[in-house]
């Protein structure tokens, strides 16, 4: 099911390509423009090399890089939609593919920090999904918490797509939210360094298994003179097994066939381990329809705005000061 890295379109389902884009070293706006040109060139080259591909995915930070000294500066921020996303839209339309792109988005409210945003563009050149990272990688990332929820859109081959960004994938509730809204192919774009390589692979698999959906994940690759980024694009089956696993090579293109209908059928026909259903219908053998209240305290507390850990008052790090971010004034807390 795609482990050989197919080049053609399957009879059912679709072919996906995840690009292990080299970590960009960005010091000026010209560098961003160069990255955009490189991404577009890579998109067209991938379509030429894999003519059956219908979805091409680029990792987090591939457009604007990770220059932490400048990533909040106006020079480095983009708008969605904007002239840069129009270039991506034009490329998708020309290549007749769906594309997933990463944008550090200027906040419409200038008093607030920027968003870390992902977009999906369809083969007609339209932005069909816009997602703002719900769980920035605290305490290192300064992005404002996303406010668009977890949107789901139609994709190729009967797929229903959702996108999470990097650390989002460590939050199992977010994958469940996507599946609860119908997602059967969960995309994860990341800019992780090697410290969490194993955990990244683990959660890609668990997010698939817990929700009976495919996961397609890709990370930046290479060295930026500070950290090494592991690449290792991964496609997981809805049973949590890894179908395709990339290596650590920058520019590696990880491809695989995805059959969304198989995930849909599992959700409809499985009894054992249909856990996304069982969560809301526990014990349905003994009680018709099961119990609909899972009785989970943390869910009730989250809904009531009262979420608090037993050890929270004693935690050492609860703001960005360890990485030099302000805790008062400016954009903080706006």
UniProtKB/Swiss-Prot annotation:
Gene: amiF
PROSITE patterns: CN_HYDROLASE
InterPro entries: Aliph_Amidase/BUP, C-N_Hydrolase, C-N_Hydrolase_sf, Formamidase
Active site residues according to the UniProt entry: 60, 133, 166
GO biological process terms on file: putrescine biosynthetic process from arginine
PANTHER family xrefs: FORMAMIDASE, NITRILASE C965.09-RELATED
Function: Is an aliphatic amidase with a restricted substrate specificity, as it only hydrolyzes formamide.
Reactions accelerated catalytically: formamide + H2O = formate + NH4(+)
GO molecular function, one term: formamidase activity
SUPFAM superfamilies cross-referenced by the UniProt entry: Carbon-nitrogen hydrolase
Name under which the protein is recorded: Formamidase
UniProt domain CN hydrolase: residue ranges: 14-260
Enzyme class label: hydrolase
Family: Belongs to the carbon-nitrogen hydrolase superfamily. Aliphatic amidase family.
Highest taxon in the source lineage: Bacteria
EC number: 3.5.1.49
Keyword field: Hydrolase
């Amino acid at each position: 099911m795609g482990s050989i890295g197919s080049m053609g379109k399957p009879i059912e389902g679709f072919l996906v390509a995840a690009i292990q884009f080299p970590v960009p070293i960005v010091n000026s706006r010209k560098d961003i423009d160069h990255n955009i040109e490189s991404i577009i060139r890579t998109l067209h080259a991938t379509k030429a090399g894999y003519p059956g591909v219908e979805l091409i995915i680029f990792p987090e930070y591939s457009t604007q890089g990770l220059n932490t000294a400048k990533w909040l500066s106006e020079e480095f921020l983009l708008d969605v939609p904007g002239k840069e996303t129009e270039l991506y839209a034009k490329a998708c339309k020309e290549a007749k593919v769906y594309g997933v792109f990463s944008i550090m988005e200027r906040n419409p409210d200038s008093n607030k920090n920027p968003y870390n945003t992902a977009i999906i563009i369809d083969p007609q050149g339209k932005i069909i999904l816009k997602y703002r990272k719900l769980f920035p990688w605290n305490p290192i990332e300064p992005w404002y918490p996303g406010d668009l929820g977890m949107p789901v859109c139609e994709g190729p081959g009967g797929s229903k797509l959702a996108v999470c960004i990097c650390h989002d994938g460590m939050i199992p509730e977010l994958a469940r939210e996507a599946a609860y809204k119908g997602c059967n192919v969960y995309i994860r774009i990341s800019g992780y360094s090697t410290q969490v390589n194993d955990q990244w692979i683990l959660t890609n698999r668990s997010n698939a298994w817990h929700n009976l959906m495919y996961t397609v994940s890709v990370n930046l690759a290479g060295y930026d003179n500070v950290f090494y980024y592991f690449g290792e694009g991964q496609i997981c089956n809805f049973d949590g097994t890894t179908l395709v696993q990339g290596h650590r090579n920058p520019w590696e293109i990880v491809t695989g066939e995805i059959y969304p209908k198989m995930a849909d059928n599992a959700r409809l026909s499985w009894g054992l381990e249909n856990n996304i259903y069982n969560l809301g219908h526990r014990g349905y053998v003994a009680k018709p329809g099961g119990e609909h209240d899972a009785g989970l305290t943390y869910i009730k507390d989250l809904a009531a705005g009262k979420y608090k850990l037993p050890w929270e008052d004693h935690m050492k790090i609860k703001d960005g000061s360890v990485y030099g971010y302000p805790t008062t004034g400016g954009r903080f807390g706006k």
